[in-house]
From Swiss-Prot:
Transmembrane segments: none annotated. It comes from Caenorhabditis elegans. Interacts with gmn-1. Residues 379-392 have a biased composition (Polar residues). GO terms for cellular component: nucleus; transcription regulator complex. This is Homeobox protein ceh-32. Disruption phenotype: RNAi-mediated knockdown in hermaphrodite adults causes embryonic and larval lethality and head morphogenesis defects in L1 and L2 larval stages of offspring.
Length: 439
């Protein structure tokens, strides 16, 4: 069973519910009193009888509310708001008659009291409507702005099921900006207003390292503390140093890119000049690319990509790919070292060819078998017999004599060649056998 004091405390805690304000309207109070009387007379209830504190607070004929004027109601709301008594403010607003409520509905103090009660009752939609549709004095803006932001924070925490960090709160403030009814429209950047930041920038341009008296003077001018002023100057100097270093890196990168492009252009011009005109060292025999001698792949290995500086340091020949001028000097030097060997080989080949051309034809020492057969075919057997020599005509006799002379000369040559061969090789047969075979 609840005592009257406990029930009063519970009712004060239940003031956060939205239905509670409607329950304390004059018509509802009469209904509650009737229900209380019927419940007490008929059947026992789990809860005790309604204490007499409700009629005393909510009855429209109560001397505390019905006899008050509009100014008295406004002053009472202001006093309760200043004291921070939200429960007392809620109970007082519930006892105001509807006629009096309409009279003070547009008053700023009454609107602030309603906004405060809605904020603590978690009626955030009603709170937003009050703050957006009514204009308030600038001296109350900070408190109302805090309620605006805190209401949005609580809504987001309820939706997400977790508390918000500083970054989350910053995003909520950006997503739900304050209405102009509680805000002068001036942006706050880095927790300082734009007017304050402009004044700090002016002092920073004059002296980036202010002494303590200047910090104190600047703090009084901006409404900040000396520590805030010192931190702002420190952070600004650090940002300027970082920006200067970044700009320096960008300038160096642009210069390097420009020099590399100039070098690439000069390299292209140099390569074009080397391909278009012959060098003074090379002989101007043929300017086509097919006659340009190429270096062997073992002397200049292919460079892997990406280029490895340690591999280039280990193999100096790979550095030639980085310097076209050095590459051409090495190329010309290699050609000068290679040209004498090529000239010697060409000279040796030409001497061999000349000797082959100048060599005289060898003298024939023997008649071929075909020639001998042709000679024999021209002489008939009757002409060769000794008995027929007288019957031959003079022309035939002359021909036979010429043939005999040729045969004798051939036989002599054969005998000479056989003798020379037998002198060199004793195994050969005698000259007589050779002559007989040739005959």
């Amino acid at each position: 069973m609840f005592t009257p004091e406990q029930f009063t405390k519970v009712m004060s805690q239940l003031g956060n519910f939205s239905q509670l304000g409607q329950m304390f309207q004059p018509g509802n109070v009469a209904m509650l009193q009737a229900l209380q009387a019927n419940g007490a007379s008929s059947t026992p209830s789990l809860f005790p009888a309604m204490p007499s504190v409700i009629p005393s607070l909510a009855a429209p004929s109560s001397p505390t509310t019905s006899n008050l004027t509009a100014d008295q109601i406004v002053k009472t709301c202001e006093q309760l708001e200043t004291d921070g008594d939200v429960d007392g403010l809620f109970r007082f607003m519930c006892t105001i008659p509807p006629q009096k409520t309409q009279e003070v509905a547009g008053n700023e103090a009454f609107l602030r009291a309603r906004a405060l009660v809605c904020f603590h009752a978690s009626h955030f939609r009603e709170l937003y409507a009050i703050l957006e549709n009514n204009k308030f004095s600038p001296k109350y803006h900070p408190k109302l702005q805090e309620m605006w932001h805190e209401a949005h924070y609580r809504e987001q925490e309820k939706n997400r099921g977790k508390s918000l960090c500083a970054v989350d709160k910053y995003r909520v403030r950006k997503k739900y900006p304050m209405p102009r009814t509680i805000w002068d429209g001036e942006q706050k950047t880095h927790c300082f207003k734009e007017r304050t930041r402009s004044l700090l920038r002016e002092w920073y341009l004059k002296d980036p390292y202010p002494n303590p008296p200047k910090k104190k003077e600047l703090a009084n001018a901006t409404g900040l503390t000396q520590m805030q002023v010192g931190n702002w100057f420190k952070n600004r100097r650090q940002r300027d140093r970082a920006a200067a270093a970044k700009n320096k890196q960008n300038i160096i990168g642009v210069e390097l890119k420009k020099t590399s492009s100039d070098m690439s252009d000069s390299d292209d011009d140099f390569e074009d000049s080397m391909t278009d005109s012959p060098s003074p060292i090379d002989e101007p025999k043929d300017l086509s690319k097919s006659h340009i001698p190429k270096l062997s792949p073992t002397l200049l290995p292919k460079m892997a990509t990406p280029f490895d500086m340690f591999a280039a340091a280990a193999n100096p020949l790979m550095m030639l790919n980085l310097n076209p001028a050095l590459y051409m000097q090495f190329h010309n030097f290699f050609n000068t070292m290679r040209n004498p060997q090529i000239d010697e080989e060409e000279n040796s080949e030409t001497t061999v060819e000349v000797e082959a051309d100048i060599e005289p034809p060898k003298k024939r020492s023997k008649l071929s078998i075909d020639e001998i057969l042709n000679i024999k075919s021209e002489v008939s057997p009757s002409q060769c017999s000794p008995c027929s020599n007288e019957s031959l005509s003079p022309k035939r006799a002359v021909k036979t004599e010429e043939v005999k002379k040729e045969d004798d000369e051939a036989a002599e040559e054969d005998s000479r060649s056989v003798k020379s061969e037998t002198s060199e090789d004793p195994k050969h047969s005698s000259p007589k056998s050779t002559t007989s075979q040739s005959e």
